[in-house]
């Protein structure tokens, strides 16, 4: 599985070349999120696979990159072919790409 830096992910997101999948809990998503993301908490992923676009590359996002890594592995095992993990999660994005995002 690919690990992308915040800068790499931001460049792809700016080109609208990927779908960001945020797997954090609702309270975390309310604190801060990346515009245009698809929010499905990790615990809901198995029941909501049909809500995740298969024809588009995915970058999975969480707080620091651990939950998103697990979800990315889960998706790859279920036939999603182009899945990457955001290394360092939204915290890395806030530090490197958008310092206006709340950090927690």
Which residues fall in each region the model found?
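Short, surface-exposed ligand- or partner-binding patches at beta-edge/loop junctions that are enriched
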Residues: 61
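Rhodanese-like catalytic fold shared by cysteine-dependent sulfurtransferases
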Residues: 1-19, 26-57, 66-104
